[in-house]
Design a protein with these regions (language model features):
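Long, positively charged amphipathic alpha-helical accessory segments at protein N-termini or as interdomain linkers
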Residues: 62-63, 72-88, 99-237
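N-terminal lobe of the biotin/lipoate ligase/transferase fold
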Residues: 1-84, 153
Length: 237
């Protein structure tokens, strides 16, 4: 993939969505003035300290109702890269990366459709690398530096992520969906045991049963009742 290095830009996702290229491209920036998380969330990042990048894909071969598989593949690449540096890294549904109980990375996906096909998909990711302090009201951010006391080369980490992501992308292109889903489940945060969750009706205890290829989370209650949720419909307490 071609990598475009930028110094300061409002959003790498928006930059790639406006690029109008048929090639797969990665845009990485030292700073994003309007970096976005999921929905209306903002991403706090000190200039030049963290890894902020987006990947533009044209996966016309992937059914629209399975687009979440791209998020799974990206999450697996992130988890593998970071876990090699700081063990105990997991994937928190739907698209965060956690070290223990703290968030070290988040991902946002923007999609353009052409009829019933996925025309353009932009996967934007922020990873806390060398930032020493966080000042926003985000509840639990953490960086590699805070964990290890060391600074890291952001480009080395980016290339490691891409080297893991591209083979996973090939698996999806060849229809090996089940392999990706299985790997994803192996690395889920809170994948074992009962944990507290909260939806519009209040707090409850449940265990993760599985996640569908469309991103739907299935939770199993203590009485074996099943509940299903899409993004933003439930959160971990």
């Amino acid at each position: 993939m071609e990598i475009i290095h930028l110094t300061d830009i409002p959003s790498t996702n928006d930059y790639l969505l406006g690029l109008h290229t048929e090639q797969d491209v990665v845009a990485v920036s030292d700073y994003q003035s309007h970096g976005k998380g999921m929905g209306s969330n903002r991403w706090e990042s000190e200039a030049g300290k963290n890894l902020l990048f987006s990947i533009l894909l044209h996966p016309t071969w992937l059914p629209v109702n399975r687009q979440y598989l791209l998020s799974m593949a990206e999450a697996l690449a992130l988890q593998g890269t970071l876990d090699a540096v700081i063990p105990d890294v997991t994937i928190k549904w739907p698209n965060d990366i956690y070290w223990q109980d703290k968030k070290i990375s988040g991902t946002r996906i923007d999609v353009n459709l052409y009829g019933s096909m996925l025309a353009d998909v932009v996967i934007g990711t922020g990873i806390n690398i060398n930032q020493r302090e966080f000042h926003s009201d985000a509840p639990n951010p953490v960086s590699l530096y805070q964990i290890t006391g060391r600074e890291y080369d952001r480009n080395v980490i980016l290339h490691d992520i891409l080297s893991r992501f591209e083979p996973l992308l090939k698996q999806l292109e060849h229809g090996k969906y089940a392999d990706i889903v299985s790997l994803y489940h192996q690395h889920l945060y809170h994948r074992d045991g009962m944990h507290p969750y909260e939806d519009d009706n209040g707090t409850f205890m449940a265990a993760i049963d599985h996640v569908e290829a469309n991103g739907m989370l299935h939770l199993r209650l203590s009485d074996s009742t099943m509940r299903r949720y899409m993004f933003k419909e439930v959160k971990t307490k």
